[in-house]
Amino acid sequence: MLNIVNVSLPSRCRIICISDLHTHWQETKKLLEHCNYKPDEDYLFILGDILERGDDNINALRYVMKLAENKRVIVISGNNDMFVHDFAVGYNQEKFCGYFNKKPNRCFMEMAESIGITDFSEQADEKRKLVYETFKTEISFIMNLPDAIETQQHIFIHAGIEGINWHNMTTKTAKNLHRFINLNHESDKTVICGHFPCYNAGRQNSNLPIFDFERRIIDIDGGAGVTLASQVNALIIDKNDDEYNYQVKYSPIGEAKTVISDYSESRTWYYADRKQAFSLLSPDKDTPTGFIKVRNNETNAEGVVPECMSGYWDGDWHVWANLNSFPSVKKGESIWVYAEYGEYCWCITESGEVGSVPKRVIDLM
């Protein structure tokens, strides 16, 4: 059975909801400032995955712990948040060594390194206990987080719900349910979740929250630390009696650049999933240098994609960027750059779109 916090909201209030910051606490702090967050008036719900996928775990955790001292702030746990406890005290020695050698846990290792431990090949149990004792307050905070928040009209959860009696589902499902945005649920309430990056859902060419009112689902995962171009999203809910209005703010990861001239290219973008198989086509006059032209073997959609965002395995080509992603920008707008290839950059634009923008229209200095 899930550990659920029930909140009876007043007739008028504002809820700010964020999720999947994945150690990016500074962007989260900027985002809350952008939302004009008022700790004495607003509710703040953080839907898990505070940790991992980044390199500032300890500071991120302590930042969230400080926020949570306010009774109007509720933090729930995500699947990535559980790893630090498992590595500290959950796994037996054999499992610890197996996982650790395969993929060292970033948060646990960050904690260990902060007290001078860099190797667990000897005296692993003693060292793990020392890490746990040193960070017992932080690890206990994570382990005591609830699984969900329920209000009059909404369910807030990390990954999603399952079944009419969703209160009784396992915590593992609550934290790991895959692609919930594409599923149906039996509750009459709107479910607000993270866990699955919005860019990967194929609904839009951006990381912005997805509103599926037919399914009563809102996904707010901006892909921070997961997708190449990523951000932390905030869903702002203004409650006025029985009316709920939604607003979105976001904070891209990284430093903003400036667009120095207008750019627009009319191409239709097509969703691409790295698990799908693609065929490599011959380039034509509309294939920019540094790009390849491909066809999706499932949908037959054709388009171009940066060659650096493609790979060949299992006898097929695969890509991990949407086809024909060339968002429009205007002079003076902000833009965030994540990769450079040929004459283009992979960016998040001020409108939130993700894609290739020519270097010549960006002040990269």
Predicted regions: what is each one?
Residues 275, 290-296, 332, 345-349:
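SH3/SH3-like beta-barrel fold
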Residues 53-146:
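Active-site neighborhood of divalent metal-dependent phosphoester bond hydrolases
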Residues 260-277, 281-284, 310-341:
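SH3/SH3-like (including bacterial SH3b) beta-barrel domains
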Residues 1-62:
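N-terminal active-site segment of His-dependent metallophosphoesterases
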Residues 122-217, 224-228, 240, 244-251, ...:
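Acidic, His/Gly-enriched loop-helix segments that form or flank divalent-metal centers
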Residues 17-19, 44-48, 74-79, 157, ...:
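Active-site neighborhood of phospho(di)ester-bond hydrolases with catalytic His/Asp-centered motifs
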Residues 295-327, 336, 349-365:
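Boundary regions of SH3-family modules and the immediately adjacent low-complexity/disordered segments
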Residues 22-26, 52-55, 81-85, 163, ...:
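Active-site environment of divalent metal-dependent phosphoester hydrolases
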